[in-house]
């Protein structure tokens, strides 16, 4: 089996990576940085996001698994002291593939420039270049829904619903549901201007089109990458036809992860 290990880059993560690679020697495992069948992320969720984007061109052929060396590893289900056991499991090759939904993003421009296409594992946000009020028309399935005024909009996946979306008051959605969630960022609501004021959960056959009314230079953040787009006509968000594949060697229940990340203080019975 072809593999690659992506490290956070700190001493602890690099040490674990080197130890894992040493154990892979003289086995059927072949290190391949271009076309790996399994990618091991050693670090935090940010490291796994980087690994995901690095290999986003071959999602149907690559599975991901994470060892977390930081404080919070929502995607990484293995602890540093379990890395030897993980290597043995990988060498045995007996694992289940779990698939999570992704966001497909298309940025359309007013000039002759071709649309740019992106994919997100956690979320995508849309704001103005200078952090002024974003004024944008929101359409759902081709029908106008509202005119939004506020700091911006966040579109998240079910697995990403536990990240920035949660801080914005959005719902937590189980990754088995193929959906995206649209959540407002500090919307303006008064007697003159009105938005729905609640997160919207859109199924896979719906799409969301956001059209800036005044601002044409838009800042988008797609997972960990922020990009400036000039002369933006609209941005379309929908559930991607592609999915991320996780290699599961043992149960890793979503709601237990939520509990352990946000509720547990380590003293639960």
Curated annotation (Swiss-Prot):
Gene3D superfamilies: Probable inorganic polyphosphate/atp-NAD kinase, domain 1, Probable inorganic polyphosphate/atp-NAD kinase, domain 2. The active site is at 45 (proton acceptor). Its EC number is 2.7.1.23. It is found in: Cytoplasm. The keyword Transcription regulation does not apply. Keywords: ATP-binding, Cytoplasm, Kinase, NAD, NADP, Nucleotide-binding, Transferase. Its cofactor is a divalent metal cation. NAD(+) binds at residues 45-46, 122-123, 149, 151, 186. Coiled coil: none annotated. Involved in the regulation of the intracellular balance of NAD and NADP, and is a key enzyme in the biosynthesis of NADP. Catalyzes specifically the phosphorylation on 2'-hydroxyl of the adenosine moiety of NAD to yield NADP. HAMAP family: NAD_kinase. This is NAD kinase. The lineage of its organism: Bacteria, Bacillati, Bacillota, Bacilli, Bacillales.
């Amino acid at each position: 089996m072809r593999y690659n290990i992506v490290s956070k880059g700190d001493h602890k993560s690099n040490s674990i990576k080197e130890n894992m690679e040493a154990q892979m020697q003289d086995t059927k495992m072949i290190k391949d940085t271009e076309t790996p069948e399994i990618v091991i992320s050693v670090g935090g969720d940010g490291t796994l996001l980087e690994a995901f984007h690095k290999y986003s061109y071959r999602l149907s052929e690559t599975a991901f698994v994470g060892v977390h060396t930081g404080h919070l590893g929502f995607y990484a289900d293995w602890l540093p002291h379990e890395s030897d056991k993980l290597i043995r499991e990988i060498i045995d090759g007996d694992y289940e593939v779990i698939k999570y939904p992704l966001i497909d993003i298309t940025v359309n421009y007013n000039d002759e420039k071709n649309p740019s296409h992106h994919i997100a594992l956690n979320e995508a946000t849309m704001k103005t270049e200078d952090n002024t009020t974003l004024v944008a028309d929101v359409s759902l399935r081709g029908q106008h829904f509202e005119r939004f005024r506020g700091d911006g909009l966040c579109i998240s996946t079910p697995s990403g619903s536990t990240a920035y979306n949660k801080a914005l008051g959005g719902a937590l959605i189980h990754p088995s549901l193929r959906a995206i969630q649209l959540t407002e960022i500090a919307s303006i609501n008064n007697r003159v201007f009105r938005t729905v004021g609640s997160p919207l959960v859109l199924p896979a056959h719906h799409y969301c089109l956001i059209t800036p009314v005044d601002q044409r230079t838009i800042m988008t953040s797609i997972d960990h990458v922020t990009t400036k787009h000039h002369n933006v006509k609209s941005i379309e968000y929908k559930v991607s036809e592609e999915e991320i594949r996780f290699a599961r060697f043992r149960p890793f229940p979503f709601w237990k992860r939520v509990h352990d990340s946000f509720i547990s203080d380590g003293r639960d019975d």
